[in-house]
């Protein structure tokens, strides 16, 4: 194969097949195989230039906010609930935690890595070996058809026109400005309550488009959402003997960035700190709520002051998303990920993940449900969708996050929300949180959450991730819409798409390419665009049956030419037909498949990267995965991947590497690993393995808290419009019940203690007067406590009702900087005296710092002195007898 360009006959064949006409001094290989691409220099690679660009485009750059220095504290002091964890072999908690509670402060900075760059152009090279293998195989076919030629051409074009990498600062900044334009431009974002929706009416729409069930399972119920994170890890037994740990924390990618205040570290490296800060935030919030903060007509200054102390929980790192971008727009197109601070991610995940992970409800298992949540195209999934399309009833729709699919007039429409996250307002997220709390965290109508969690979900979390801020270089800048990648991104986007479908139903379902449909943008303040439309969709799908070619799933042979596909763009999947199975089966959209083949991502898992032999193992996984997701349908790509995977296998075997051990972790090595989650995949593609992968199986049974209206979204939309739906008990009522139950349980406990005391000290007529009076005194004391607790319960319950009835979102105001040169001042990153009451956390932890000059040290700010005095008073009160 290495000689394919050395043979005159081969060069002549290649030239003729691909229309290459080399001039003097050129050869065929140079013209067909793209050279190493050197990206253009980034014009915004400095804080001052980036700040200036943003300001010139009307983008808000914020006054820099400083962070307290991290200080070390013993883990057992900060997390006494989890002291047992450090006694377990392989425990993840370190002996000490590094917490942001120091007296000195600094301005944080974050400089993302952009690759490839002018300095490192070959950071993610294209797969030239695969291209040469395909050219070699092409030359072996005496009369190669146009389909085979197209495979080589498509791979070559992708290598030439695209590059895999993380873009540029200019691309990130351009994306920010585009997000702002969506949020504030021709169709500015609109709060749903101002459009006539209520949280309950939106929830009733989501009952159809995203039905959810309770967290946990029948045989293992989930604990209520009433605890701090450290109490979600429950030890039963003795760590020195037999024990079991019940883990009620959400699943989190511990290899991802930890965010502020731990720039450059992963969540796994700061798991203790993540739990500790979340604990403290929720406990402080609970304390302030009990004091009346946030209730109707009360002073909110304490709550806003606390949120100001924790400002970093609303500031994500602006992380460039690595993708396969067009070289022509390399400078200006980079997608951003809002890398949330790990405590923020943990707390919001504690609300969303237990419910959503246990709600496998979609169009496959619930009649009338248009959701594609947890949809998998394999095992007959795509065939069910094609059958749905072929059914004569229409118009009809499917929805997943910011993707909408509509069949209308025998035409298939794939619609995307335009920069979906930018369309989200804080009220949209409030509605999403309302839905998760009232539909998911509910046990037969009773709430499984308390006032603290309801207030966090409804009144605080939306401000942390929507219209918040981000850090890039040393600039703190505003974000418009929700930060992409936060723990509520999916449900927020799904809610937006649901509102679009609701308006479509109320308009009597016009064609998506009509002006009437387009007017939904203005009405809702939600932008969208038609990504793909296919006319005569039923005819084209039926043609696949007639045109299916012999192949792995049609005759059990290697394909000699590809079967035709219909590119539905259904979450990236197309449809083709299997004669052997008699069903439609999924293949990755052709453009996406060949783009993935052109540019490998490489080993992204840092813990696997250091393993000897991992690069060869990655090749095995990559090539076989490409075949599984659709490469099996394209003769040259299939054969080239098969040959290259075989060569990598033989290399590992010759070196004595444990291939089975590597392949056991194949989902960590493949970008398509999620598509095969839960499947027992053998990474050797054969007719049998492909048939097993695509053989239809019954869908998972649904798990819902309330029955879904089989009339579908249209029936619910019309019923809401005409008022036939009753507005059921809202969140405030559930919080009232949750808080009352919690507080009145305290009263019941106090009363029980009094009764227990009475039983333990009977009124013995022979007892002396002193003993009888002591008994009476104890009983009166306990009864008085019970009475006070009961009264307090009623008062706090009333406050809770008023607090959550409010639709306001609590957030401090952060000033904008007018001069970009000030915002990008190089002093950022230096340490300076504390300027705000960040000691609130230190005070409640009982952890303070001291200076040689004491509390009145001149380098301390007024707030730092105030917090030091508070800690001193607390210390003195603890020392009193």
UniProtKB/Swiss-Prot annotation:
Pfam families: Birna_RdRp_C, Birna_RdRp_palm, Birna_VP1_thumb. It catalyses: RNA(n) + a ribonucleoside 5'-triphosphate = RNA(n+1) + diphosphate. Its EC number is 2.7.7.48. Residues 846-881 are annotated as: Disordered. It is found in: Virion. GO terms for molecular function: GTP binding; RNA-directed RNA polymerase activity. InterPro entries: Avibirnavurs_RdRp_C_sf, Birnavirus_RdRp_C, Birnavirus_RdRp_palm, Birnavirus_RdRp_palm_sf, Birnavirus_RdRp_thumb, Birnavirus_RdRp_thumb_sf, DNA/RNA_pol_sf. RNA-dependent RNA polymerase which is found both free and covalently attached to the genomic RNA. May also contain guanylyl and methyl transferase activities. This is RNA-directed RNA polymerase. It comes from Avian infectious bursal disease virus (IBDV). The lineage of its organism: Viruses, Riboviria, Orthornavirae, Birnaviridae, Avibirnavirus. The gene is VP1.
């Amino acid at each position: 194969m290495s000689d394919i360009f050395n043979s005159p006959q081969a060069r002549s064949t290649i030239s003729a097949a691909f229309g290459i006409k080399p001039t003097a001094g050129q050869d065929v290989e140079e013209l067909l195989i793209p050279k190493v691409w050197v990206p253009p220099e980034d014009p915004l690679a400095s804080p001052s230039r980036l700040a200036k660009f943003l300001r010139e485009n009307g983008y808000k750059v914020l006054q820099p906010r400083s962070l307290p220095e991290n200080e070390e504290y013993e883990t057992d002091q900060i997390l006494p609930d989890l002291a047992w964890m450090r006694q377990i072999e392989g425990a993840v908690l370190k002996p000490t935690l590094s917490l942001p509670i120091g007296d000195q402060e600094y301005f944080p900075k974050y400089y993302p890595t952009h690759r490839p760059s002018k300095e490192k152009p070959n950071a993610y090279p294209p797969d030239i070996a695969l291209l040469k293998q395909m050219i070699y195989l092409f030359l072996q076919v005496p009369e190669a058809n146009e389909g085979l030629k197209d495979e080589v051409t498509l791979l070559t074009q992708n290598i030439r026109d695209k590059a895999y990498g993380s873009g540029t600062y200019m691309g990130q900044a351009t994306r920010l400005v585009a997000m702002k334009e969506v949020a504030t431009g021709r169709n500015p974002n609109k709060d749903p309550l101002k459009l006539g929706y209520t949280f309950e009416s939106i929830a009733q729409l989501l009952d159809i488009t995203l039905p959810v069930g309770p967290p946990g399972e029948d045989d293992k119920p989930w604990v209520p959402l009433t605890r701090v994170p450290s109490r979600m890890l429950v030890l039963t037994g003795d760590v020195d003997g037999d024990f079991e740990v019940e883990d009620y924390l959400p699943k989190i990618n511990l290899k991802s960035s930890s965010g502020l205040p731990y720039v450059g570290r992963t969540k796994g490296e700061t798991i203790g700190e993540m739990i500790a800060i979340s604990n403290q935030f929720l406990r402080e919030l609970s304390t302030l709520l009990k004091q009346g903060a946030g209730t109707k007509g009360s002073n909110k200054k304490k709550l806003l002051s606390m949120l100001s102390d924790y400002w970093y929980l609303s500031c994500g790192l602006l992380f460039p998303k690595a993708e396969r971008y067009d070289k022509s727009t390399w400078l200006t197109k980079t997608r951003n990920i809002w890398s949330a601070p790990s405590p923020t991610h943990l707390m919001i995940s504690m609300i969303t993940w237990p419910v959503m992970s246990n709600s496998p409800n979609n169009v496959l298992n619930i009649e009338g449900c248009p959701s594609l949540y947890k949809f998998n195209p394999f095992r007959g999934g795509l065939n069910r969708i094609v059958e749905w399309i072929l059914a004569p009833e229409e118009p009809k729709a499917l929805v997943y996050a910011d993707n909408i699919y509509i069949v209308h007039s025998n035409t298939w429409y794939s619609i995307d929300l335009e920069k979906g996250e930018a369309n989200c307002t804080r009220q949209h997220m409030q509605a999403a949180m309302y839905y998760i709390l009232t539909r998911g965290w509910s046990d037969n109508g009773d709430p499984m959450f308390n006032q603290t969690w309801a207030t966090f979900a409804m009144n605080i979390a939306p401000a942390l991730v929507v219209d918040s801020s981000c850090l890039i270089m040393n600039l703190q800048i505003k974000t418009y819409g929700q930060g992409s990648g936060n723990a509520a991104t999916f449900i927020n986007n799904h809610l937006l798409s649901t509102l679009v479908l609701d308006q479509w139903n109320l308009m009597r379902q016009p064609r998506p390419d009509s002006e009437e449909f387009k007017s939904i943008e203005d009405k809702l303040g939600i932008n969208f665009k038609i990504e793909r439309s296919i006319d005569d969709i039923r005819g084209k799908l039926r043609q696949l049956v007639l045109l299916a070619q012999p192949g792995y799933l049609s005759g059990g042979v290697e394909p000699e030419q590809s079967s035709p596909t219909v590119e539905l763009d259904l979450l990236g999947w197309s449809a083709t037909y299997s004669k052997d199975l008699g069903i439609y089966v999924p293949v990755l959209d052709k453009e996406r498949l060949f783009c993935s083949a052109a540019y490998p991502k490489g080993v992204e898992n840092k813990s696997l990267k250091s393993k000897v032999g991992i690069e060869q193992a990655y090749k095995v996984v990559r090539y076989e995965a490409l075949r599984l997701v659709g490469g099996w349908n394209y003769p040259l790509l299939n054969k080239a991947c098969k040959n290259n995977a075989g060569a990598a296998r033989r290399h590992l075997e010759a070196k004595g590497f444990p291939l089975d051990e590597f392949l056991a972790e194949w989902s960590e090595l493949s970008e398509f690993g999620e598509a095969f989650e839960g499947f027992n995949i053998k990474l050797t593609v054969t007719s049998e393995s492909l048939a097993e992968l695509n053989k239809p199986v019954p869908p998972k049974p649904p798990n819902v808290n309330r029955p879904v209206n089989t009339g579908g979204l249209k029936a619910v939309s019309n019923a809401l419009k005409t008022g036939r739906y009753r507005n059921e008990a809202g969140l405030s009522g559930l919080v009232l019940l949750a808080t009352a139950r919690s507080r009145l349980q305290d009263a019941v406990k106090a009363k029980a203690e009094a009764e227990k005391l009475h039983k333990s000290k009977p009124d013995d007529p022979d007892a002396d007067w002193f003993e009888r009076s002591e008994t009476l005194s104890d009983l009166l004391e306990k009864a008085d406590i019970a009475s006070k607790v009961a009264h307090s319960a009623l008062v706090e319950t009333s406050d809770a009702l008023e607090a959550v009835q409010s639709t306001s979102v609590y957030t401090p105001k952060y000033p904008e900087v007018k001069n970009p040169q000030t915002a990008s001042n190089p002093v950022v990153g230096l340490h300076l005296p504390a300027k705000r009451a960040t000691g609130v956390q230190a005070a409640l932890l009982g952890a303070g710092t001291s200076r040689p000059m004491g509390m009145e040290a001149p380098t301390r700010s007024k707030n730092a002195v105030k917090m030091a005095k508070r800690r001193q008073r607390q210390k003195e009160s603890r020392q009193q007898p």
